[in-house]
């Protein structure tokens, strides 16, 4: 849920005064003839542009972030921030951005048309028409005219009639139109706030569902003009040159939303709203900034909620307070970090393992010393309490939470009522106020007893022993073995245990692991369990996986998988530590579970749960093909698992080696992602990581070969390849047919031959609509330009049919890389 747009809706007012500077023009007096074009260029942050006659505004491609694509925009060109006031919102990509080399052309039949470097159309202003020319006006409006005179007012399209998140003077909002916020300052996806002139003439400001941003999925209403009288409804929201904003009604009466502004008398101010329609006056001279509430739409306290639905100004577990000019400020509590560091208004995640109520964990959880409270004075979370008590003092209130595994926080009323409210995670509508009469106490794991997963520089300073202990303390969900498990031990293993006990650090780790149902094994124990490593299950880039049998309490045996790292070198050491650290922190039904590990001398092994149905590769590449329904369910489940790694862990995790051989199936054919040996933790305060090339041929994203920053989009690429394998039941690289699957799949899609991908698969042939959707999603995922790939949340939503899937462009328009016969192998390798 929820991120508040850094810029809810911009309302920009300009006083047009004569300018004293003449700027170079790409077009003559704002007139753009048919055939003119602009190209997005990596060589400069702002590509070539067309300027309005005064030079106040520019039109062209803008690159917002170094590693992202471009957006077609209109912006202020005479201020240093180059503030964008319009952007092509309906770009036919999942990210809303277009790649380097894309071109916008003014055409006779489509008006403004964006095409990628291969000529694939990404967006157009008109579905049809006969455009004679375009004109870029001094008030920031780009207008397309029909054949004939401009004076005839035969306007086919204009940016003013298709607003995005900004309203300029002389720009009006018609019935049924709306302004929509951006997700963040640097994200051009639709945000969750909308200012709309409804069909009944009522002007309303809404908060929308953050996931869908749909106008039909309204959470909160902040304002309405009540101009919905059936006899005299509002017909237009007018914004004039005097700074006056009003709803024009049918009988020409005005409902004034904002009076004329006296500040319009100063030299050419720009009004830019941020936060909840709060204005900032930025003169062209940029010497001063003046703020205030715009439109009268602001409440006295925008942090104060009016209903329990949605999460208002700040995300879950985030605290809202009012700063200067009544602007909402959001801040994560101590021991919490932003889910998206670029969005201060978003959700906050705990940096510790939260208490659970699983029966097997109650012994540990019952120790109240494991937890403590952080205190947030004059802070309240008004919704979501599940129990309340009257006449409790503060200590009794906190004690009731410590002994309750459901309780995440308590709110204690400091007024005369002395009331205590218990809350569960996530906490919503957090508000801090100097006049608040409540204190919040959030329950966190006690640092003095157990280290917790951390982010930032502190994590880098922890040595391996401390990391291991903290990981073990974070894995109470892995309950395959009870601390009372008794293992058969040979005399050799007993002696090894005695020797091991002399190592204080190893003893500490073992004790910690046993307390939390995770085991530190000796080499002898695992050698006995695997019958001296005789039954091989599979091989990876750095190790071999063996089948093993461990005796548990009662004399029964449990089957396990033991991964033995077969070479001891720096990379192996790094892989071993990464795998234990990463898997020990996560628990999700589509991720493999860790049981324990061995780190004895030069022997490094990891013990997993055993999944009886083997790998997805064995499941897919067999005859007869698995059922189409099973394959669809597996595709969605794997996407959810990767989404969890990328967005829902306390630290973002990049797997780096997604492929069918690393997907295991349980007895119900539920997929679980395994082999995190190549995983890289991407700390929450970073945007990318540079690393050695890792992965498996056929699944490796192009940026690995270009010494480019590695982001979570490498997993998206690998998933796209695997999704094609799931659809076709063919390997990414087929040596027998000498076929590269991604090339063949795109050719079939481009030529309308999708049935070739599912030949002899009657079940899939009867569901070609889903087949086509999955193939299009896969092609989006394998785009060579990583900025064109969707994130895994978008992928999951597309798989589930929640969001539309547009036709993808050629995924490899620039690629000169070819697989040699020698390299046509799907064996796991480490690419250097």
From Swiss-Prot:
A GO CC annotation given for this chain: plasma membrane
Keywords for the protein's UniProt record, in alphabetical order: ATP-binding, Cell membrane, Disulfide bond, EGF-like domain, Glycoprotein, Kinase, Lectin, Membrane, Nucleotide-binding, Receptor, Serine/threonine-protein kinase, Signal, Transferase, Transmembrane, Transmembrane helix
Regions crossing the membrane: 462-482
Highest taxon, organism lineage: Eukaryota
Cytoplasmic-side positions: 483-832
Spans within the Extracellular topological domain: 25-461
Domain EGF-like: from-to ranges: 299-349
Major location category of this protein: membrane
A Pfam family per the record: Pkinase
Family from the record: Belongs to the protein kinase superfamily. Ser/Thr protein kinase family.
Name used for this protein in its record: G-type lectin S-receptor-like serine/threonine-protein kinase RLK1
Source organism of the structure: Arabidopsis thaliana (Mouse-ear cress)
Primary gene name: RLK1
């Amino acid at each position: 849920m929820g991120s508040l747009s850094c810029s809810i809706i911009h309302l920009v007012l300009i006083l047009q005064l004569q300018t004293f500077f003449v700027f170079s023009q790409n077009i003559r007096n704002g007139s753009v003839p048919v055939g003119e074009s602009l190209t997005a260029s990596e060589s400069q942050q702002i590509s070539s542009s067309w300027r309005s006659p005064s030079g106040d505004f520019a039109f062209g491609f803008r690159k917002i972030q170094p590693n992202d694509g471009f957006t077609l925009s209109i912006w202020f060109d005479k201020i240093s921030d180059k503030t964008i006031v319009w952007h092509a919102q309906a770009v036919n990509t999942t990210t809303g951005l277009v790649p380097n080399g894309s071109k916008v052309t003014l055409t006779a039949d489509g008006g403004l048309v964006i095409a990628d470097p291969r000529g694939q159309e990404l967006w157009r202003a008109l579905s049809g028409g006969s455009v004679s020319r375009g004109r870029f006006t001094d008030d920031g409006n780009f207008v397309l005219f029909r054949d004939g005179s401009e004076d005839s007012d035969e306007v086919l399209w204009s940016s003013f009639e298709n607003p995005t998140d900004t309203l300029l003077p002389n720009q009006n909002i018609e019935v049924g139109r709306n302004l929509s916020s951006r997700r963040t300052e640097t994200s051009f996806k639709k945000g969750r706030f909308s200012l709309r002139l409804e069909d009944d003439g009522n002007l309303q400001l809404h908060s929308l569902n953050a996931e869908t941003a749909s106008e039909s999925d309204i959470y909160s209403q902040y304002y309405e003009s009540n101009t919905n009288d059936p006899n005299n409804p509002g017909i237009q929201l007018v914004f004039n040159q005097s700074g006056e904003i009003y709803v024009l009604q049918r009988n020409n009466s005005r409902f004034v939303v904002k009076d004329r502004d006296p500040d319009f008398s100063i030299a050419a101010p720009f009004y830019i709203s941020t936060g909840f329609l709060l204005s900032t006056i930025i003169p062209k001279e940029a010497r001063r900034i003046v703020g205030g509430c715009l439109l009268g739409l602001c409440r006295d306290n925008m942090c104060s909620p009016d209903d329990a639905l949605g999460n208002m100004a700040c995300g879950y577990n985030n605290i809202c307070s009012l700063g200067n000019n009544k602007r909402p400020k959001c801040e994560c509590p101590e021991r919490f970090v932003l889910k998206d560091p670029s969005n201060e208004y978003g959700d906050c995640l705990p940096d510790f393992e939260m208490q659970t109520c699983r029966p097997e964990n109650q012994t540990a959880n019952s120790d109240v010393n494991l937890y403590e409270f952080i205190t947030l004075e004059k802070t309240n979370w008004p919704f979501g309490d599940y129990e309340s008590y009257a006449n409790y003092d503060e200590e009794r209130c906190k004690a009731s939470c410590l002994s309750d595994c459901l309780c995440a926080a308590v709110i204690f009323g400091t007024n005369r009522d002395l009331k205590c409210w218990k809350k569960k995670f996530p906490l919503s509508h957090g508000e801090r106020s100097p006049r608040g009469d409540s204190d919040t106490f959030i329950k966190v794991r006690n640092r003095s007893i157990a280290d917790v997963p951390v982010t930032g520089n502190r994590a880098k300073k922890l040595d391996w022993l401390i990391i291991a202990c903290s990981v073990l303390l974070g894995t109470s969900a892995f309950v395959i073995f009870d601390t009372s498990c008794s293992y058969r031990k040979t005399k050799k293993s007993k002696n090894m245990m005695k020797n091991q006990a002399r190592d204080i650090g190893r003893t500490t780790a073992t004790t910690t692991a046993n307390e939390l149902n995770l085991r530190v094994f000796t080499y002898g124990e695992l050698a006995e369990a695997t019958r001296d490593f005789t039954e091989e299950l599979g091989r990876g880039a750095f190790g071999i996986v063996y089948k093993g049998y461990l005796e548990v309490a009662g004399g029964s045996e449990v089957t396990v998988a033991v991964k033995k790292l077969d070479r001891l070198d720096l990379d192996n050491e790094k892989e071993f530590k990464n795998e234990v650290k990463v898997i020990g922190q996560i628990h999700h039904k589509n991720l493999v579970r860790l049981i324990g590990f061995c780190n004895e001398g030069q022997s490094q092994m990891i013990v997993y749960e055993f999944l009886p149905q083997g790998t997805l590769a064995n499941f897919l590449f067999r005859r007869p093909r698995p059922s189409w329904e099973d394959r669809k369910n597996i595709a969605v489940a794997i996407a959810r698992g990767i989404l969890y790694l990328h967005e829902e862990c306390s630290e973002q995790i990049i797997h780096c080696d997604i492929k069918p051989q690393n997907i295991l199936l349980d007895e119900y054919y539920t997929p679980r992602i395994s082999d995190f040996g190549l995983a890289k933790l991407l700390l929450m305060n970073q945007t990318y990581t540079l690393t050695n090339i890792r992965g498996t041929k056929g699944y490796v994203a192009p940026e690995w070969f270009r010494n480019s920053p590695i982001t979570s989009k490498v997993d998206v690429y690998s998933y796209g390849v695997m999704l094609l394998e799931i659809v076709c039941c063919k390997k990414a690289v087929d040596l027998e047919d000498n076929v590269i699957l991604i090339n063949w799949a795109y050719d079939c899609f481009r030529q309308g031959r999708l049935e070739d991908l599912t030949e002899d698969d009657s079940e899939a042939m009867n569901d070609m609509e889903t087949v086509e959707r999955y193939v299009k999603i896969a092609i989006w995922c394998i785009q060579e330009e990583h900025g064109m790939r969707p994130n895994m949340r978008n992928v999951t939503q597309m798989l589930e049919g929640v969001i539309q899937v547009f036709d993808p462009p050629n995924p490899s328009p620039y690629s000169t890389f070819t697989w040699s016969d020698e390299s046509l192998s799907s064996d796991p390798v480490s690419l250097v």
